[in-house]
């Protein structure tokens, strides 16, 4: 059966190296590695098996970084903890176990354990001792050492809102501003990778390439229905458009209702999530904004002379979001 969440993006990170740092009791042959190689076939994904002892693991990763000079490092769970320490690279940390020693104790990771994925050395089982836990507690004391403003700009943390294993959002956010909650659990699946991790990889790639995409302004009123839910196909359309265009949500700024801004932000986090993080514009004068397109149910006369192309959602040409998708499919990325 075809996986509805997986598709390929040959141009994404094309010709670049991505270092993937796996989680606890995993290996470089995890499903996430296969997923990344499938989705980004022109990128080289490097995924070493990590030694059990943390100092050996971070030493290995630093050697790999020195040899391979990856364009991006992605680390999950325990791998996110190591990723934080790899200074000087663009990095994405997914549900990072920044207090790994404490996590091992609180989630019954002591004693005999089994690797969840095959390893190149053939080892299948291992034992977590108190001494090993102490090693992990010691290594995590080096998280956040020597961070400067440049490092803060190069790191993004993604935190599943259903993660019951690790909760380090607040700890991460005290050091890095780009802390984003996504819809998902601790273990990354196809849906969370495609809808949450991949948009961030796209931002990194665009930044590295200094790539400018056509800008689509999306009126908040075009996304929300009369019941406060997402309009039909609005979520699908937003995610699809974000693969090619630079999208911003435009919401009304009401001077006498400051709480409304928080309500809009929470709605966007719930229904659009990661692709719209940091991309909400609050204004009472959207006609003054610069963009190539504006998707808005308002009539032309209400916009006061928007300089781009106005797509009026709900009129005879664009009755639904599906018709908006068809329009942009025909444009081919223009």
Regions found by a protein language model. Give the residues of each.
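Short, acidic loop-to-helix structural element flanking the phosphoryl-transfer center
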Residues: 224-248
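Short, hydrophobic beta-strand segments that form beta-sheet elements in well-ordered domains
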Residues: 71-75, 91-93, 155-161, 281, ...
């Amino acid at each position: 059966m075809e996986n509805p969440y997986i598709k390929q993006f040959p141009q994404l990170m094309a010709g670049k190296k991505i270092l993937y740092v796996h989680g606890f009791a995993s290996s470089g042959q995890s499903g996430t590695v296969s997923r990344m190689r499938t989705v980004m076939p022109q990128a080289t994904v490097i995924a070493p098996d990590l030694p059990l002892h943390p100092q050996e693991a971070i030493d290995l990763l630093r050697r790999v970084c020195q040899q391979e000079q990856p364009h991006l490092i992605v680390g999950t769970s325990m791998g996110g903890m190591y990723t934080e320490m790899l200074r000087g690279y663009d990095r994405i940390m997914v549900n990072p176990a920044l207090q790994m020693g404490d996590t091992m104790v609180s989630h019954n990771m002591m004693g005999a354990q089994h690797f969840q994925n095959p390893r190149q050395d053939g080892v299948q089982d291992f034992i977590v001792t108190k001494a090993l836990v102490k090693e992990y507690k010691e290594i995590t004391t080096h998280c956040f050492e020597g961070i400067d403003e440049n490092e803060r700009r190069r790191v993004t943390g993604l935190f599943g809102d259903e993660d019951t294993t690790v909760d380090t959002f607040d700890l991460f956010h005290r050091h890095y501003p780009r802390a984003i909650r996504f819809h998902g659990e601790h273990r990354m699946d196809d849906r969370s990778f495609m809808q949450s991790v991949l948009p961030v990889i796209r931002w990194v790639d665009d930044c590295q390439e200094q790539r400018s995409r056509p800008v689509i302004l999306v009126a908040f009123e075009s996304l929300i229905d009369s019941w406060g839910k997402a309009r039909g196909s609005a979520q699908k359309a937003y995610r699809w458009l974000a693969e090619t265009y630079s999208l911003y949500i435009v919401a009304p700024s009401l001077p006498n209702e400051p709480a409304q801004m928080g309500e809009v932000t929470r709605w966007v986090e719930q229904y659009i999530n990661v692709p719209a993080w940091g991309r909400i514009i609050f204004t009472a004068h959207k006609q003054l904004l610069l963009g190539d397109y504006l998707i808005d149910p308002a009539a032309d006369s209400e916009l006061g002379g928007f300089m781009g192309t106005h797509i009026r959602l709900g009129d005879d040409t664009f009755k639904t979001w599906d018709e908006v998708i068809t329009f942009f499919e025909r444009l081919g990325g223009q």
